[in-house]
């Protein structure tokens, strides 16, 4: 039992170490809308721990956004650099934005990468931009909390499963030990009974045969045959609670026994 417990403890330690390595490896998940990410549920893993969002056409303000892992970019020289492009009006636009958290590039708002359109829009546009930032911050916080719960569940479920498995193994071992002990006790009792009945039967059979041989020999002409043997036989039969229907008679001079 101690050996099995030590094996189970070592197995749990190895599982925890493997989970720690996986969690600290540096890979994060990113939202990906490329064609090769359809099969993986519009998600990808980044070994560089970076996700990106960029405009398909940096010269067009209304250009759609594309998202993915930074590893999938063909050119790695300009990774996470603030590249500036200019549209038709000449205002600078960030063509690439990087982040380093799980699903941090999952933003469906067009104004994530779109700056304000100039000072001419006035104070209202500035307030609208601040509101958009607050909304984005709230979305990021909600996503972070969901990811935190997801990580906790990923860690807790295997540990709980391992503990339940250990408890089931310990319960099965205990049941097997008790069953084995009970079977051994039954076997010992059966062997002792067989041994006692075998030796007791042979000893009683030998005593009865000896008494029969002794009682077949007469003591004298017309005297009772083996009075001592009769007493011993009656004592043995009374001890075993067996009633005998045969009584030894008188020995006659013709050399035969009479039964009553």
Curated annotation (Swiss-Prot):
Extracellular topology ranges: 27-152
Recorded GO MF terms: frizzled binding
Leader peptide range in chain numbering: 1-26
Keyword Phosphoprotein among UniProt keywords: no
CDD domains the record matches: TFP_LU_ECD_BAMBI (cd23576)
Subcellular location: Membrane
Membrane-spanning intervals of the chain: 153-173
Topology of the protein relative to the lipid bilayer: Single-pass type I membrane protein
Cytoplasmic side of membrane: 174-260
Keywords for the protein's UniProt record, in alphabetical order: Glycoprotein, Membrane, Signal, Transmembrane, Transmembrane helix
Top-rank taxon, per record: Eukaryota
Residues listed as glycosylation sites in the UniProt record: 87
GO BP, sorted A to Z: cell migration; negative regulation of BMP signaling pathway; negative regulation of osteoblast differentiation; negative regulation of transforming growth factor beta receptor signaling pathway; positive regulation of canonical Wnt signaling pathway; positive regulation of cell population proliferation; positive regulation of DNA-templated transcription; positive regulation of epithelial to mesenchymal transition
Cellular-component GO terms for this entry: cytoplasm; plasma membrane
SUPFAM superfamilies linked: Snake toxin-like
A Pfam cross-reference name: BAMBI_C
PANTHER family in the cross-refs: BMP AND ACTIVIN MEMBRANE-BOUND INHIBITOR HOMOLOG, RIIA DOMAIN-CONTAINING PROTEIN 1
The protein's role, per its UniProt record: Negatively regulates TGF-beta signaling.
Assigned protein family: Belongs to the BAMBI family.
Name under which the protein is recorded: BMP and activin membrane-bound inhibitor homolog
Lineage, top ranks: Eukaryota, Metazoa, Chordata, Craniata, Vertebrata
């Amino acid at each position: 039992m101690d050996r099995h417990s030590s094996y189970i403890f070592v197995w749990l330690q190895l599982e925890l170490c493997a989970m720690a390595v996986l969690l600290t490896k540096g890979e994060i998940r990113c939202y990906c809308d490329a064609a090769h990410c359809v099969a993986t549920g519009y998600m990808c893993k980044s070994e560089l721990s970076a996700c990106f969002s960029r405009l398909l056409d940096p010269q067009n303000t209304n250009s759609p956004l594309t998202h993915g892992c930074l590893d999938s970019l063909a050119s790695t020289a300009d990774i996470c650099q603030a590249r500036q492009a200019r549209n038709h009006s000449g205002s600078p636009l960030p063509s690439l934005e990087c982040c380093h958290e799980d699903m941090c590039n999952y933003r469906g708002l067009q104004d994530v990468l779109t700056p304000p359109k100039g000072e001419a829009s006035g104070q209202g546009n500035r307030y609208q931009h601040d509101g958009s930032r607050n909304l984005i911050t709230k979305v990021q916080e909600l996503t972070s909390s969901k990811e935190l719960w997801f990580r906790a569940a990923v860690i807790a479920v295997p540990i709980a499963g391992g503990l339940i498995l250990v408890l089931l193994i310990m319960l099965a071992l205990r049941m097997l030990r008790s069953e084995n002990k009970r079977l051994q006790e039954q076997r010992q009792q059966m062997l002792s009974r067989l041994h006692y009945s075998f030796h007791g039967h042979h000893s009683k059979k030998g005593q009865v045969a000896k008494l029969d041989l002794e009682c077949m020999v007469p003591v004298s002409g017309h005297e009772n045959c083996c009075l001592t043997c009769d007493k011993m036989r009656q004592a043995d039969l009374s001890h075993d609670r067996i009633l005998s229907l045969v009584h030894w008679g008188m020995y006659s001079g013709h050399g035969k026994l009479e039964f009553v």
